[in-house]
């Protein structure tokens, strides 16, 4: 009888990536098949996120529902992973003694051994350590699920922003070697992946080891990924302004595979609040990065993160944030009301902004961003956009759906053979959450490259020094 696994995932794209790796790992080692129905499962895993408010209570509410399933089936294994597991550890079992496994983001690769241990002597297992890069060394080969894929290139963060739990739950920055990343992406490309999204809590801080023992930069890695045959689009998330260096901006100038869309969190437009947040950059420095980016790639669109109602935020501070939003003309944002995370420095600050004021500021900010996003969408009306076709439309099974470079969903009439390929679509209608278009060119008519070697990418990104000597630093 087939053994079944149910994974419930909350949080960021890194958590989604981790959950997919858990599923692949337990399929390879134990033959577990994924199910969307918790009642069918032999193993239940909850991959948690500590970013949102009341994250811990949300976990225990979910575990309470699963407790009823365990009472009916004592052999059921329940595991809790992710960032809340890292924060709470043994405390989870103190409140929910029926939980069998507690593991952190850096120990998910040990799940097979943990399950074997529980199956063997029924003793619970808690492992929330930080074994650095070992996690990636023990994961199964990647498996493509459509034309887009996420690839984690690093873990953790060294920035210690005062509101953020990531350094405490995922540890400090650890970069994967470049060869491991490139091999994983090449495997995905061979399975039909056309677009790859490089993941990291602070992805542009990547400093991985190269094959020759040298340390590579994120800009180097982007160019090498662009050289992989079949990869026609590259995205990455999430970046930090302090490490968005000029060499990364140069990649936007000479590497068309890198999309004209960037998510670059800023959090606030007030230097005073940025200082309290420990962001180590100013609003002016952030805008300088955007100016350089738009000089290199004039059509680039920017999204960001914002926190409103941070302790001490005044009306003047908030107005500075609104000015930054107008100056940069953000295309979209992830915006939140501040809520303290236990164990962070901001949790000890006086939360002196009234709740109603926080809600009002969030509403004003989101309305402005929505207006700007709609204005960006309207500019696309009548233009031709290249779409990576992901599958059938959610709105109609008779239509296809895909995404533009700037992450807009486009629905259009097409044929099944277009799925997984690029099409050029003329935008005919603009809606608040999507666009509509008609196909004007198929991939066969585009003349996309058939193959390109790393050497050819290096050749076309060749620079010359003051003496006229060409160079490229891999």
UniProtKB/Swiss-Prot annotation:
Keywords (A to Z) from UniProt: 4Fe-4S, Cytoplasm, Iron, Iron-sulfur, Metal-binding, S-adenosyl-L-methionine, Transferase, tRNA processing
Subcellular localization, as worded in the UniProt entry: Cytoplasm
Residues reported to bind [4Fe-4S] cluster 2: 157, 161, 164
Domain MTTase N-terminal: 3-120
Catalytic activity: N(6)-dimethylallyladenosine(37) in tRNA + (sulfur carrier)-SH + AH2 + 2 S-adenosyl-L-methionine = 2-methylsulfanyl-N(6)-dimethylallyladenosine(37) in tRNA + (sulfur carrier)-H + 5'-deoxyadenosine + L-methionine + A + S-adenosyl-L-homocysteine + 2 H(+)
InterPro entries (alphabetical): Elp3/MiaA/NifB-like_rSAM, Methylthiotransferase, Methylthiotransferase_CS, Methylthiotransferase_N, Methylthiotransferase_N_sf, MiaB_methiolase, rSAM, rSAM_horseshoe
Cofactor(s) the protein requires to work: [4Fe-4S] cluster
Chain ranges of the TRAM domain: 378-441
GO CC annotations on file: cytosol
Cofactor notes: Binds 2 [4Fe-4S] clusters. One cluster is coordinated with 3 cysteines and an exchangeable S-adenosyl-L-methionine.
NCBIfam families: miaB-methiolase (TIGR01574), MiaB/RimO family radical SAM methylthiotransferase (TIGR00089)
Known role: Catalyzes the methylthiolation of N6-(dimethylallyl)adenosine (i(6)A), leading to the formation of 2-methylthio-N6-(dimethylallyl)adenosine (ms(2)i(6)A) at position 37 in tRNAs that read codons beginning with uridine.
PANTHER family xrefs: CDK5 REGULATORY SUBUNIT-ASSOCIATED PROTEIN 1, MITOCHONDRIAL TRNA METHYLTHIOTRANSFERASE CDK5RAP1
Family (UniProt): Belongs to the methylthiotransferase family. MiaB subfamily.
Name of the protein this chain belongs to: tRNA-2-methylthio-N(6)-dimethylallyladenosine synthase
